[in-house]
């Protein structure tokens, strides 16, 4: 029978079933069962004894925390590995790279359901695009010398790697000769401090998938193959539709217009819309058209919006406001600091705006139609409005609702 817990400590169970202990007063938890601190049961306790008990309790708690951190690291290393995400291999419909939570990766065939640690020859040329994490090659002799202290021989390391591959694929697909000549340990560019500490202390240790983990992993891959139907549907798209879908991908990813294609396309490989176009040449062509469109749109927007803030400010003010009052209040406002416009220009625009805004809506719309006719612009198509129209008071006095009613009218 286990001893009762000290006052303030309660026992709980983690989702993994491992018990841990929590002290609400100290706001601390530990996997190590707390024990009673010996007390003097005499009626009188001296101050020195109380101080000694406190110091002992503090040291015990520090030791428990250190033990807890060690147990937590060991527990994480014992947890089964799981697939984290996968990447499609360019120019190949059958193979994907699967990355696991333990920072490992392998190659999986979606059609044959075979998996390999080493890339098959048919996809080796396409892997450079993915920029996979570096795998450090370790020779047989050096790996044997490293495993002397850890108690694990090179033969056992090879057996683990072979055992993992055997569980994840059909045995007929393995090439044993390559495994026996070279071992592979994976080294990533970005690692947390905790992971680096674990690697230093357990550099020769390899985690092994269990049968349950492999079944779960393959099930995950089977479930995710639905997303690849998009690529099959892409063959039914017309050329124009495919180009439109690819352009939408560039917009959704917020691709800048001044980035080179060589740096852009690796960011798009994970999206199925990248494959609606069947060649890199067509993708680059659509990308260049997209860049030209973005640049031209920015130039037009910059030109069109010269007085937009000024018109917005006037709409927010009462129609009875006079120029002297406006000038006194907004003289130093950034809204009136527009290159090419003097104070006299703003006064003229202000007075015209205040007069025209008091007219009936039909009169305002009629004046605007005459303005558009003089500029040979369709008043129902805002995309055609030029700078001269957008900076004219006959356009500025119209509200958004009035412009919408004009666009919806049949005349």
From Swiss-Prot:
Quaternary organization: Component of the spliceosomal complex. Interacts with prp19.
Record keyword Repeat present: yes
Region Disordered: start-end pairs: 65-84, 138-209
A single MF term (Gene Ontology): RNA polymerase binding
Residue span(s) of domain WW: 3-36, 89-122
Biological function: Component of the spliceosome involved in mRNA processing.
PROSITE patterns reported for this sequence: FF, WW_DOMAIN_1, WW_DOMAIN_2
GO cellular component: cytosol; nucleus; U2-type prespliceosome; U2-type spliceosomal complex
UniProt feature, compositional bias: Polar residues: 140-151
Matches recorded under InterPro entries: FF_domain, FF_domain_sf, TCRG1-like, WW_dom, WW_dom_sf
Disruption outcome: Cells are defective in DNA replication, S-phase progression, chromatin structure and cytokinesis. Dre4-54 truncated temperature-sensitive mutant has 'Trp-117' changed to a stop codon.
Residues annotated as domain FF: 239-293
Bias type Acidic residues, positions: 167-179
Residues in coiled coil: none
Primary residence: nucleus
Name of the featured protein: Pre-mRNA-splicing factor dre4
Organism of provenance: Schizosaccharomyces pombe (strain 972 / ATCC 24843)
Gene assigned in the entry: dre4
Gene3D superfamilies: 2.20.70.10, FF domain
Keyword annotations from UniProtKB, A to Z: mRNA processing, mRNA splicing, Nucleus, Repeat, Spliceosome
Lineage: Eukaryota, Fungi, Dikarya, Ascomycota, Taphrinomycotina
Annotated Basic and acidic residues bias: 66-83, 152-166
Entries under PANTHER family matching the protein: TRANSCRIPTION ELONGATION REGULATOR 1, WW DOMAIN-CONTAINING PROTEIN
Gene Ontology biological-process annotations: mRNA cis splicing, via spliceosome; mRNA splicing, via spliceosome
Keyword DNA repair set for record: no
Localisation: Nucleus
